[in-house]
Amino acid sequence: MAVAVAMAGALIGSEPGPAEELAKLEYLSLVSKVCTELDNHLGINDKDLAEFVISLAEKNTTFDTFKASLVKNGAEFTDSLISNLLRLIQTMRPPAKPSTSKDPVVKPKTEKEKLKELFPVLCQPDNPSVRTMLDEDDVKVAVDVLKELEALMPSAAGQEKQRDAEHRDRTKKKKRSRSRDRNRDRDRDRERNRDRDHKRRHRSRSRSRSRTRERNKVKSRYRSRSRSQSPPKDRKDRDKYGERNLDRWRDKHVDRPPPEEPTIGDIYNGKVTSIMQFGCFVQLEGLRKRWEGLVHISELRREGRVANVADVVSKGQRVKVKVLSFTGTKTSLSMKDVDQETGEDLNPNRRRNLVGETNEETSMRNPDRPTHLSLVSAPEVEDDSLERKRLTRISDPEKWEIKQMIAANVLSKEEFPDFDEETGILPKVDDEEDEDLEIELVEEEPPFLRGHTKQSMDMSPIKIVKNPDGSLSQAAMMQSALAKERRELKQAQREAEMDSIPMGLNKHWVDPLPDAEGRQIAANMRGIGMMPNDIPEWKKHAFGGNKASYGKKTQMSILEQRESLPIYKLKEQLVQAVHDNQILIVIGETGSGKTTQITQYLAEAGYTSRGKIGCTQPRRVAAMSVAKRVSEEFGCCLGQEVGYTIRFEDCTSPETVIKYMTDGMLLRECLIDPDLTQYAIIMLDEAHERTIHTDVLFGLLKKTVQKRQDMKLIVTSATLDAVKFSQYFYEAPIFTIPGRTYPVEILYTKEPETDYLDASLITVMQIHLTEPPGDILVFLTGQEEIDTACEILYERMKSLGPDVPELIILPVYSALPSEMQTRIFDPAPPGSRKVVIATNIAETSLTIDGIYYVVDPGFVKQKVYNSKTGIDQLVVTPISQAQAKQRAGRAGRTGPGKCYRLYTERAYRDEMLTTNVPEIQRTNLASTVLSLKAMGINDLLSFDFMDAPPMETLITAMEQLYTLGALDDEGLLTRLGRRMAEFPLEPMLCKMLIMSVHLGCSEEMLTIVSMLSVQNVFYRPKDKQALADQKKAKFHQTEGDHLTLLAVYNSWKNNKFSNPWCYENFIQARSLRRAQDIRKQMLGIMDRHKLDVVSCGKSTVRVQKAICSGFFRNAAKKDPQEGYRTLIDQQVVYIHPSSALFNRQPEWVVYHELVLTTKEYMREVTTIDPRWLVEFAPAFFKVSDPTKLSKQKKQQRLEPLYNRYEEPNAWRISRAFRRR
């Protein structure tokens, strides 16, 4: 009855009146009558069935259609019953009356419409006319055209001489009238006003058309100039012969009244009128009235520090100065930016106070300069030596004099923005090195996110676990604690071995300045108890030491191997299906031949005549290895007809027709060419892995296939969730490749396992000792866990004695060299059995024959983003039901098998999600949002994601981009953001690299970014750890690990990229060569975008500033109690023991990443000055008010000095009240 009432209410209306109540009663009476009829004829009295019959009768008003609908739904009613029901329903259920109200019917809002109202910033209109990057051919054509124009253009020197001659003739003949001068001035003013109005009208347009606007403005200005003016030949000439310089020339040479006030950025002649200890006053010439300005002591000379102003200038001396800023009649000047002989501007990009700067001034700058920030103007480039130097302190009388001058309005406070009213300290005059600066987070939200950030909304972390209190979640937490215990036990063993060294020898190790022989003996003694070889005993036994041979062995030829694959029998049907459909979903088991054969079949069918065949892979290693295999089968060299492209490595040529690439590289190609015009077919392989890039490609390619009817899209998956892919891609047909499957027996545990690692090893030993022949596959979460399991299992098997059959233990994880990974494909020798202990890479990416037994603990390690803390973490979580089925299927490929699930059946049913959470819903999306914005996609809510990411993650990503300067106050991409999108790096690294161009250290930053992109630069052999540490310490820099990496690369470069040098210094030569390749790629990108690559020499402060500009979110301050505390969330972190700063413990640092092992460790740490945080991230940090308690100080606990007569907390006010 309740269902009937609810349905009646939904059908009739939401606001019940007398008529509505009567209609509800009529509907209930009808339901009751239909139930009676059904009970009389069929013996069924079901209200739900009665309501269903009523709904069918309302949709089908005639007898024939009503009968047909009933038969279609499986009803076996007689004609008499059908006619009675239809007559009864039509009689008792009157038709709905049309609405008499004049108000329009309000439809209920969909979920997406509600989200659009809540988050308007996420649904801004897209910008289809987004600028795309030019390829190398376009750049070459443009350069050739500019060279031709340059050849036709008269020289600049000739134009200057011609102007000077005309000016001299005009001056001598005195034929120019004042009325004509006034008219020309008026025309120029009108022209400027028109330009300003034009800018105001176009200010709200899309930022992607900024380059076109600038070009049109400059063209219009050139058309309005004299007939003798030639068009500019390039962007530099545009600035050189721009309107601003033309006005300056007229100001100097045309006879007209001088201006009343100076212009910011212009250069004037002047005379020194007075000298102070902090600078000198200069009277400007060429103005109508007397105008004086201050040249600060730091603005006098570029070369070195000035101790005494009188050493540089004298009273009455004539100088050339540049106007930096002025407030009222008080002006700030600079001499160091002007050549005192020629008057040339040595630093034209510098601005000091932009408040008075007109929009026309800024419009003349190069729009592609990457120094534009929507939040903060880029910090000025100071003189060559940027290190902070202690200057002479200002005397008390001088301080008093400055205060009196400010109080008398002779000097303005605005000229000294950092002036401290209490102490009278001027900026950069007497900075205190040991000043304790308090930095706080800016509480203000970005304008376009007001009310939506974590400051005003409760942002919860993404839930990737179905039941956080279930047995699987508890087992995952228990395993983390057990792993920590095992690490600590190993550490204690090592320390015990160290303590066993005789004290007489150990003193040479403790002594900071020992003799060489004693140090060597101590180093050797420290190796006691260590493994004498790099390879542990279990690993030597597994891989056969140095005598092992790697590679999958087979007697079949390449053609026979191809014909043995399951997909070969379906070759013709597959090619025909691709021909008949624009989008095709291909489902096939791992090892069926999808990845290697489909591209070749389509190439043989002639699809390469229309373009390339592109195939994406979720992993770099897969793209490289598959391309190598296909090139062998195709009969060509790798890089010719078949090639691959991964980040920082392009192994293709103009002849390439089959191209394998990572999904991220195809996404970058979409950034350049949204329609992918050079491809005829795109194949998204391993789509079931649902990486971030794959999910974004789904939405982009959906649009592309609608624009390009000639393009084919193939989506392949190894799992059985094909229906979801088909529904997403316009109900695309599904092509299934039948695999070799056998029945698999599923076995569950009766009780939950607390230590799944130990349970896995016990299960493996039971299988080995009791079950028939057949190899075993065990799924664990990561490298550390797998190595531990292999070591424990080897020791346990060894303890059973020689009579037990041999068990070959083989680990598999991504960090293992590929040649060692191939050992798992070799069959076990007769009388023995192999056990493969692998990560989830063996679920779908690897096909291992001979597996009959699968041990599944039910866990996987996933990267999860916490939007509250803004940190990505690797977390051990329960797998999904789809993953559990996939793992069990591994046991049924060779023959009937068994799957041992180390969890209960109830846990499988109640604690596991149906499918795993896509990566796009659990990771940081800053890079993804930046790429989408660069493609002109601003409406993120309407973007067709297969599974939409959480709103909290999108908002956090936009907030991060805003603080980096990539988004403006409206949430749209800035020029800096567009530049950042063109680098294949994380946004923070992009910002760091681009800012280094402005700071003049881009050559060093290129090297640092390249070294950060590779892993394991140093290595420590266990038998030579002391020597390796000693060699590494030679490269340590006091500034931090980033500059240590720079020192390593530069030393390698100075030693002519020598491999023996790397071996001698315990440095991975392969990692350095990889960094060198990455550096070349990044250098090419910077050259393509005309970004200067300059060196800072010994001025490493520039490098530190550049690092701070990108990684300011990762700032941490030393905590008085222990370690460091991050500024964002006050999390306790520690400097990693391998860091160059481990023994220095500086006050302020920024780190590259956090690593969770026994503690939260900071990796790649660099010291910073806290002032830089405010300088480079004013939208994120601010200097706390010294008159108020900051949040950090409020959290600190006051600990009194020891008093033997009182309790420690007796001094507190709360205790004093209690005593009363």
Curated annotation (Swiss-Prot):
Which terms does the record give in the GO molecular function aspect? ATP binding; ATP hydrolysis activity; ATP-dependent activity, acting on RNA; identical protein binding; RNA binding; RNA helicase activity
The protein's matches in SMART domains, at most eight in alphabetical order, are given as:
DEXDc, HA2, HELICc, S1
Residues bearing the modification Phosphoserine: S395, S460
Positions annotated to bind ATP: G588, E589, T590, G591, S592, G593, K594, T595
The highest taxon in the source lineage is: Eukaryota
Q: Which reaction does it catalyse?
A: ATP + H2O = ADP + phosphate + H(+)
The EC class name is: hydrolase
Instruction: Return the annotated region ranges for Disordered.
Output: 153-266, 337-372
Q: What is this protein called?
A: ATP-dependent RNA helicase DHX8
Quote the tissue specificity entry: Expressed in skin, cervix and nerve. Also expressed in the brain.
Q: Which UniProt keywords apply?
A: ATP-binding, Helicase, Hydrolase, Isopeptide bond, mRNA processing, mRNA splicing, Nucleotide-binding, Nucleus, Phosphoprotein, Spliceosome, Ubl conjugation
Q: Which organism is it from?
A: Homo sapiens (Human)
Could you say which EC number(s) this protein's record lists?
3.6.4.13
Q: Where is this motif: DEAH box?
A: 685-688
Q: Give the comment on domains.
A: The RS domain confers a nuclear localization signal, and appears to facilitate the interaction with the spliceosome.
Hey, which family's this protein in?
Belongs to the DEAD box helicase family. DEAH subfamily. DDX8/PRP22 sub-subfamily.
Composition bias of kind Basic residues appears in 170-179, 197-210
SUPFAM superfamilies registered for this protein in UniProt:
Nucleic acid-binding proteins, P-loop containing nucleoside triphosphate hydrolases
Compositionally biased intervals (Basic and acidic residues) = 160-169, 180-196, 232-259, 362-371
- Locate residues linked as Glycyl lysine isopeptide (Lys-Gly) (interchain with G-Cter in SUMO2): K140, K399
Subunit comment for this entry? Identified in the spliceosome C complex. Interacts with ARRB2; the interaction is detected in the nucleus upon OR1D2 stimulation. Interacts with SRRM2. Interacts with CACTIN.
Q: What does the UniProt record say this protein does? A: Involved in pre-mRNA splicing as component of the spliceosome. Facilitates nuclear export of spliced mRNA by releasing the RNA from the spliceosome.
Entry-linked InterPro entries:
DEAD-box_helicase_OB_fold (IPR011709), DEAD/DEAH_box_helicase_dom (IPR011545), DHX8/Prp22_DEXHc (IPR044762), DHX8_GH2-like (IPR049588), DNA/RNA_helicase_DEAH_CS (IPR002464), HA2_WH (IPR048333), Helicase-assoc_dom (IPR007502), Helicase_ATP-bd (IPR014001)
| Compartments (UniProt record) | Nucleus
Residue ranges of the S1 motif domain? 265-336
Q: Which GO terms describe its cellular component?
A: catalytic step 2 spliceosome; cytosol; nuclear body; nucleoplasm; nucleus; spliceosomal complex; U2-type catalytic step 2 spliceosome
